């Protein structure tokens, strides 16, 4: 099962997959962290696409996802999802984070994408504890792919060594069950 899930230490903006996931803010207008990096690398086309989505449906609430073209990125599309802001764990954060991953996967599936790359959603300025967020990510994706043939390849693209090791350890433990 886990042969479809991979961990990469690197820059998500350089990964050549069908879709990359952007840990966006509700405005979809770019920001800090991975969101800002994706917007900078994609160029003005991405901001224009996000503005079109905003005009059509307004902001993207936590747990939801929308899809746009990828601009100058090597990916075909960007799936923008909004993870929850960590507020101590008593405000439905786990469910919202699960939904962010699940809705991103469903958009990839609906668009026929066979490969998708995820950052560690909500673990930057949104403050979600890394280990808890990684467990939700791995469990959500593993459960999704056990029932579906697509996407064929899923990548967790981790910006730092500590997060990379965390995802590798979780996937190894899951493979042992």
Curated annotation (Swiss-Prot):
Domain of life: Bacteria
Pfam family, one: Macro
Record's protein name: O-acetyl-ADP-ribose deacetylase
Lineage of producing organism: Bacteria, Pseudomonadati, Pseudomonadota, Gammaproteobacteria, Enterobacterales
UniProt key word ATP-binding: no
GO biological process: purine nucleoside metabolic process
Function text: Deacetylates O-acetyl-ADP ribose to yield ADP-ribose and free acetate. Down-regulates ribonuclease 3 (RNase III) activity. Acts by interacting directly with the region of the ribonuclease that is required for dimerization/activation.
Listed EC numbers: 3.1.1.106
Subunit structure: Homodimer. Interacts with RNase III.
GO MF term (any one): purine nucleoside binding
Species annotation: Citrobacter rodentium (strain ICC168)
Annotated gene: ymdB
């Amino acid at each position: 099962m886990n042969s479809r899930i991979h961990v990469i230490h690197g820059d998500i903006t350089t990964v050549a997959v069908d879709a990359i996931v952007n840990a966006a803010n509700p405005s979809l207008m770019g920001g800090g962290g991975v969101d800002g990096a994706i917007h900078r690398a994609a160029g003005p086309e991405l901001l224009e696409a996000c503005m079109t989505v905003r005009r059509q449906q307004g902001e993207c609430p936590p747990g939801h996802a929308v899809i746009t073209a990828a601009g100058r990125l090597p990916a075909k599309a960007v799936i923008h999802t909004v993870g929850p802001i960590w507020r101590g764990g008593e405000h439905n954060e786990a469910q919202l984070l699960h939904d962010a991953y699940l809705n991103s996967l469903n958009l990839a599936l609906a668009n026929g994408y066979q490969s998708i790359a995820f950052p560690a959603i909500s673990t930057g300025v949104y403050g979600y504890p890394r280990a808890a967020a990684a467990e939700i990510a791995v469990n959500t994706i593993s459960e999704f792919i056990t029932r579906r043939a697509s996407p064929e390849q899923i990548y967790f693209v981790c910006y730092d060594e500590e997060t990379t090791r965390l995802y590798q350890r979780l996937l190894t433990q899951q493979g042992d069950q």
